[in-house]
Amino acid sequence: MSARAGIVVTGTEVLTGRVQDQNGPWLADRLLELGVELGHITLCGDRPADIEAQLRFLAGQGVDLIITSGGLGPTADDMTVEIVSRFCGRELVLDAAVEARIGEIVKGMMARFPGVDADAVLAANRKQALVPAGAVVLDPVGTAPGVVVAGSPTVVVLPGPPRELQPMWHAAVATDAVQTAIAGRTRYQQQTIRMFGLPESGLADTLRDAEKTVADFDRLEITTCLRRGELEIVTRFEPRDTATYAALEGLLRDRHAREIFSTDGALVDDQIAELLAGRSIATAESCTAGMLAARLTERAGSSAYVAGGVVAYSNAAKTELLGVDAGLIERHGAVSEPVAEAMAAGALQRFGADTAVAITGIAGPGGGTPTKPVGTVCFSVALAGGASVTRATRLPGNRSDIRERSTTVAMHLLRRALTGGG
């Protein structure tokens, strides 16, 4: 049986949703890469009894490794190290070398704040130099060191900020204690297929058939997820089952070739960035109010191909900023394929681009009519030279869902236009 792990994400701000947890999913991926089975991710607040209860729960599940995140700061509610020390039966001791290192970091930070009492800050941060006796101390990235406490289970204590946790994790994995804890791991392979335009029921039908026709199908660990209107199929398997996975992938390709857009885990955003190399794109948005432009510019280096965008929310803005004929809007309505086409053409001209995408729709909750209900969205992708792809669809969900799904639809229409998929 493979080595197993559990993760405890601490922090009342995470528990209550004020801060979104990034550490649990990131650590889950890293464990998967190591071939370690993840049994549980738990969230709890800053109360010591709650944190200790999570540690005892995971230990009772027989995990070999527990990883905690958060609660390593200098304030009174940062008590994770103390709780782990008690859980592991270790005395809490002051590490002079760690104290000196933290002192150097704090003095460097305080040099930028001459009016602050550095000695008072140092006294508060002294708490961070208290570590369980015999623990391996991980050098701080911020001011908080991490610790690794060997045992059954071994416990890795990491800071909460992802920018500190992520580099420290690699140091933790290299320790003898963690290597011993995960010695029984099984090396897995993981493959991801992404689809767009296929309902979950259609994929479910194919997987039911695969269960009957693909030899050793039960040796594949398959998870599916619908996100942003896309289907993600993640399959994990041992190297000896590569042929079984190949048979599954072949069946998916046979049934859903048009809907599959990625078999190597690449996101549509990655593909669009590659397809736009050497091109210039402009956006014209109404109901999404700049969300598509924001998504296109999330990738570093996007300034090489994103010329600009216009948020033309009102009819007047569509006319004044994009040159859409007011009579066209009067005849067809602002949410219509002709207006979407005119918006895309206007963006091409305004920015001197060779590619443009336009979105106009009714995100709700009001504004719908019997002929154009809430969720009606029209898209147009225009390429220099006259080629264009225009679509109208009705998207489900609330206002936020419709706006987010609209950006996804637009990205896929753009992908198909740039690859000649129509």
Curated annotation (Swiss-Prot):
SUPFAM superfamilies documented for this protein: CinA-like (SSF142433), Molybdenum cofactor biosynthesis proteins (SSF53218)
Disulfide-bonded cysteines: none
InterPro entries in the record: CinA, CinA-like_C, CinA_C, Competence-induced_CinA, MoaB/Mog-like_dom_sf, MoaB/Mog_dom
Gene3D superfamilies given in the database record: CinA-like, MoaB/Mog-like domain
Family to which the UniProt record says this protein belongs: Belongs to the CinA family.
Name the record gives this protein: CinA-like protein
Organism (species): Mycolicibacterium vanbaalenii (strain DSM 7251 / JCM 13017 / BCRC 16820 / KCTC 9966 / NRRL B-24157 / PYR-1) (Mycobacterium vanbaalenii)
